[in-house]
């Protein structure tokens, strides 16, 4: 299970989540039915070589649409919703419209559902970026607890590993026998890791040359982070094409606000080098527990925090599943049906 301990990483996760929720809200509920689609039109009475013009639905104009089933099967996926607001061309009673009416009668040659484009490009990129960033956070936390970290004060003591406390409690309560193998293993790991960190800080190039696996792990961690942030920032630079006329100004402003905030937050986290705490040396050395109350307090706090985090995850996952099942048909109807 994943618990985001770093406030910097947590802020980025919250911003990405909020950005994705805003996009989903606009796609499902925020777009007006008259501003979901764009149409490639040509005024009635003009030559066939006249260039097509993309425009959104305008109630002051008369849009003559294609038949119910286009002869060449040229409709795009989910574009049928765009033809619901059109008038079939064969039911128009007049033969040749007057010149004054030509500018108000449009023949529709193609329709595009812009919500489909938004759903399958931006929303998907945000979701993929969100999962990649969570994968980066998971790898980073595991490396801080068990791997090589520089500077050394960023290391997390392996003894705080939840499995260590859980194994100790289970063995002492149910088995009535002290189990210390995990504790000894973590202590040995802590000593070896401190030696590796000293070697890495002395000569990083030689260290990574003789231990390429560590370099690969760190490289994968950095790649996940940069790819995730790149996908999120890239959503603001995706070409909207002709669909730009349907998207409101607030969506553009909201997109750039979220993207710039996420990018600046990550840049600040990367460039910022916080000073080492004054008691870093004391904290690095293993200290003795101050009596039974200190041991019980540490055990209870870590176990209860782990249980609370797992309960929160279960509640969030269950809530998302229930909401998705309850509103699945409604979401599909709003997106792709009439």
Curated annotation (Swiss-Prot):
> Residue ranges, Extracellular compartment?
31-121, 234-243, 323-338
The impact of changing residue 99 to N is:
Induces cell-to-cell fusion capacity in cell culture
State the residue spans of region: Involved in fusion: 31-121
List all annotated glycosylation positions: 48, 58
Provide the topology term for how it sits in the membrane: Multi-pass membrane protein
- Per the record, which residues fall in region Interaction with UL20? 265-301
Instruction: Give a short account of what the protein does.
Output: Glycoprotein that probably modulates membrane fusion events during secondary envelopment of cytoplasmic capsids that bud into specific trans-Golgi network (TGN)-derived membranes. Also plays a role, together with gB, in virus-induced cell-to-cell fusion (syncytia formation). Seems to block fusion of virions with infected-cell membranes.
Report the protein name in the record. Answer: Envelope glycoprotein K
Q: State the organism of origin.
A: Human herpesvirus 1 (strain 17) (HHV-1)
């Amino acid at each position: 299970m994943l618990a985001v301990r770093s406030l910097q990483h947590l802020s980025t996760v919250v911003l990405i989540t909020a950005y994705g929720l805003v996009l989903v809200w606009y796609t499902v509920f925020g777009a007006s039915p008259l501003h979901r689609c764009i149409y490639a039109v040509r005024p009635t009475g003009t030559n066939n070589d006249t260039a097509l013009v993309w425009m959104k639905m305008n109630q002051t104009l008369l849009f003559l649409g294609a038949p119910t089933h286009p002869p060449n099967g040229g409709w795009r996926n989910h574009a049928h919703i765009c033809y619901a607001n059109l008038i079939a061309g064969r039911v128009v009673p007049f033969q040749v419209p007057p010149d004054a009416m030509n500018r108000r009668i449009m023949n529709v040659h193609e329709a595009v559902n812009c919500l489909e484009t938004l759903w399958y490009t931006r929303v998907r990129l945000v979701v993929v970026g969100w999962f990649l960033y969570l994968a980066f956070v998971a790898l980073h936390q595991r490396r801080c607890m068990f791997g090589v970290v520089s500077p050394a004060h960023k290391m997390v003591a392996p003894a705080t590993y939840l499995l260590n406390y859980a194994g100790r409690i289970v063995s002492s309560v149910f088995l009535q026998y002290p189990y210390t193998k995990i504790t000894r293993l973590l202590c040995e790991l802590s000593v070896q890791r401190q030696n590796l960190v000293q070697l890495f800080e002395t000569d990083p190039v030689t260290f990574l040359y003789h231990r390429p696996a560590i370099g690969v792990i760190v490289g994968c961690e950095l790649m996940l982070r940069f790819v995730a942030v790149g996908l999120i920032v890239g959503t603001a630079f995706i070409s909207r094409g002709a669909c730009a006329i349907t998207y409101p100004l607030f969506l553009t402003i909201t997109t750039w606000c979220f993207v710039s905030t996420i990018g600046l937050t990550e840049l600040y986290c990367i460039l910022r080098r916080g000073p080492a705490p004054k008691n870093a040396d004391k904290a690095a050395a293993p200290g003795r527990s101050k009596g039974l109350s200190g041991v019980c307090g540490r055990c209870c706090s870590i176990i209860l925090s782990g249980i609370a985090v797992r309960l929160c995850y279960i509640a969030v996952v269950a809530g998302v599943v229930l909401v998705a099942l309850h509103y699945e048909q409604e979401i599909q109807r709003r997106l792709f049906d009439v």
